Amino acid sequence: MTAEGGVQYSKIAEIKGPLVIVDDVENAAFDELVEVETKDGERRLGKVLEVGNGKAIVQVFEGTTGLSIAATNAKFVGKVMEMPVSREVLGRVFDGLGRPKDGLPDPIADQFIDINGEPMNPEQREYPKDFIQTGVSVIDGMITLVRGQKLPIFSGSGMSHNLLAAQIARQASVIGTQDDFAVVFAAIGVQYSEAEYFRRSLEESGALKRSVLFLNTADDPAIERIITPRVALTVAEYLAFELGMHVLVILTDMTNYAEALREISAAREEVPGRKGYPGYLYTDLSTIYERAGKLNGKKGSVTQVPILSMPSDDITHPIPDLTGYITEGQIVLGRDLFRQGVYPPVNILMSLSRLMKDGIGEGSTRADHGEISNQVYDAYSRAQEVRALAGIVGKAGLTEIDLKYMDVGDVFENEFLSQATDENRTIEETLGILWKIVSKLPRNEITKIKDKYVDQYYKEE
């Protein structure tokens, strides 16, 4: 039966989990948008996951609760899901499917763009090399974020990743340029209180004016979580590559996204992979993470900070494990530091920004940045070794230089790593604290910094 704007079918073979299986379907296409109508006239959106042998498997975004085989119709609308985009999306709050959630009307659209995006031609990619200042010392100083990079945060259940995500969203900026900067924030499967915190945090700081907020809460259908990062990245790509803005995309929590993917896979009775996740989890995650970058001839950039909570703090779990293969480093939050009350509790010895070397130094941050960072990494690593030794032989068994390294570890955690959630430090302040840490050591222990920088910045205590 042909309906206005599409083809309508009423022969539903089966409803299983979030899926509706439609019989006797002709000419349906993969990813095609479907309107599923209930007996009460309620319309729910879905998309085609699989077509073959006259059947179509439809994934219903709002869930299948209340649907019956006898009284459900499915209209195949003949197009893929698209997100309306324009400059007017800035300052707006949307739900996980891209519908307004702030009580305001739909923004006037300049374009309608397929949420799956266009793959970036590797030949057209430009190497990321420009510094983004987050105002968080440990990131700016030791795990530097670069425009066009994808740098995930690996956290654990109950830790302070949401505070860190909101702080980065409020404070992030590009320095040394007049280019426009925007933040696209997508909350995926978060609690209502967390969603409200993100909204209030951006509103009260004034950062919402340059931001676009997508909120998918825990009581929304799990299947909606598959769509949320894609609509967010569609908006980010439009702002970056059509309007020439530098866009930071924060996605939290990607673990909830992967759980939704596992739910769909189980409903389709696919052969499970590691821990029940589908075998294509790596490929699916790459379709999200690889949408970060810069393009030759385009002024803007898309930078991603995906956040995921590691089940049981297990960094070898499939989600962080596969994420690490695709992205360019990781920021790992440590449970021990969190228990000590350190914020942000970043374990720098497990963290890395693979593109840091290209975004720092003279002309970007400061000429001594790379060397002072390496020296502090070395000193903090030595401090951890000394702490372990002190746990065995006691402080009385330590040498004078060992005690100095212990002091370095304490100053690093209490003055550099720790900062208030509303404290926005410049890169100059961050580097100043790093030199204060190094100055706790005798000059002959400083082996990774050129003498000219030591002469300029070192102040022995």
From Swiss-Prot:
Keywords: ATP synthesis, Cell membrane, Hydrogen ion transport, Ion transport, Membrane, Transport. GO terms for molecular function: ATP binding; proton-transporting ATP synthase activity, rotational mechanism; proton-transporting ATPase activity, rotational mechanism. It comes from the Archaea. It is a peripheral membrane protein. It is found in: Cell membrane. Pfam families: ATP-synt_ab, ATP-synt_ab_N, ATP-synt_VA_C. One of its GO terms (biological process) is proton motive force-driven plasma membrane ATP synthesis. InterPro entries: ATP-synt_VA_C (IPR055190), ATPase_a/bsu_AS (IPR020003), ATPase_F1/V1/A1_a/bsu_N (IPR004100), ATPase_F1/V1/A1_a/bsu_nucl-bd (IPR000194), P-loop_NTPase (IPR027417), V-ATPase_su_B/beta (IPR022879). PROSITE patterns: ATPASE_ALPHA_BETA. GO terms for cellular component: plasma membrane. Belongs to the ATPase alpha/beta chains family. Component of the A-type ATP synthase that produces ATP from ADP in the presence of a proton gradient across the membrane. The B chain is a regulatory subunit. PANTHER family: V-TYPE PROTON ATPASE SUBUNIT B. Has multiple subunits with at least A(3), B(3), C, D, E, F, H, I and proteolipid K(x). This is A-type ATP synthase subunit B. It comes from Nitrosopumilus maritimus (strain SCM1). The gene is atpB.
